Amino acid sequence: MSNGGDQQQHGLLGPDGAPGRVVVVTGLSGAGKSTALHALEDLGFFCVDNLPTSLVQPAVEACESGGITRIGLGIDVRVGSFLAGATAALDSIRTGRDVVILFLDASDETLLRRFSETRRPHPLTTGGSGAIAMLDGVLLERERLASLRARATIELDTTRLSTHDLRRVVIERLRPARVEVPRMSTRFVSFGYKYGIPLDADLLFDVRFLDNPYFVHGLRELTGNDEPVREYILKNPDALEFICRTEQLLSFCMPRYASEGKSYLTVGIGCTGGRHRSVVLTNALSDSLRRKTGLPITVVHRDVARVSTSGVPSGVGEGMAGAPGVDLRLAQPGATPSEPRPASDTSVTGGER
């Protein structure tokens, strides 16, 4: 049985019994180190950027003492005395650990273009201006990093890679065993246009062309989570056609958004008050797409619990009991969903149109 000192000296085993993994991300400035670190974070790595080489071993040991077995470290020429301490620092953490050095590079032309687009100076540019000074910085950085490049476990040329491509490559090459590739999280939000559109929506669909149950006796105080409202809306051929066509569009788009590295997708479906038509169609589309795409989908009915003209909170009662995915927060008109409306404020004027 090893004591705490042995554990620190020989590293910490992961949940599967494998040695802890430390990925050191380095390379040319502008080659994509930040993107690579973000990809590691998506894989569950604890990442620290711009770490001085003298703190590499203490940082790794501190993480392991807290039970962290996947660690990402970003090191570049902006760190003082980089070359002097890099070799010793990396050697100090190799024992008992799976240490990977990821070196990122790109063509001089590509690096210059990226710095020009971001309007940021190269970290080694100490004087002069324009492309000549920038190129001098790139060439000097290549020279300084030559010895570390020779020690790299993985070398990636990002010249022809977009940020999404680089993220995908890093995940493919460095994903630990038993760790799933991060999947895009999709959220469907039903809402009422009279209260404003969801500010975080990527896609919006307007279903106010359908007949409104608000004007049907016995349906006004119900919501789209109640079966009578659902039956009323879905007996309309236009509603079924909308579901079919929108499902085809989203089943085409969603996997492609996910493959491009998009982490979140918010789809808004709106009617006038957000209590009837949008709720029914949001439920129908999300259920179908969840089965077809296999992507995680959550549902929020933002305005389903707003107060109707009668003063009775719509949807409150037997029809709402246990309704899945219902957000019962009462938001102020024009406010974001994170700003709850006081429960005592039930003033809503005017009926639906």
UniProtKB/Swiss-Prot annotation:
Keyword Membrane: no
Compositionally biased intervals (Polar residues): 344-353
GO MF term list: ATP binding; GTP binding
S-S bridge residues: none
Binding site for GTP: 76-79
Keywords attached to this entry: ATP-binding, GTP-binding, Nucleotide-binding
Residues reported in the UniProt entry to bind ATP: 27-34
Family annotation (Pfam families): PapZ_C, RapZ-like_N
InterPro entries in the cross-refs: P-loop_NTPase, RapZ-like, RapZ-like_N, RapZ_C
Domain of life where this protein originates: Bacteria
Annotated segments matching region Disordered: 310-353
Family according to the record: Belongs to the RapZ-like family.
Protein's job: Displays ATPase and GTPase activities.
Protein name: Nucleotide-binding protein sce5766
Protein source organism: Sorangium cellulosum (strain So ce56) (Polyangium cellulosum (strain So ce56))
Taxonomic path: Bacteria, Pseudomonadati, Myxococcota, Polyangia, Polyangiales
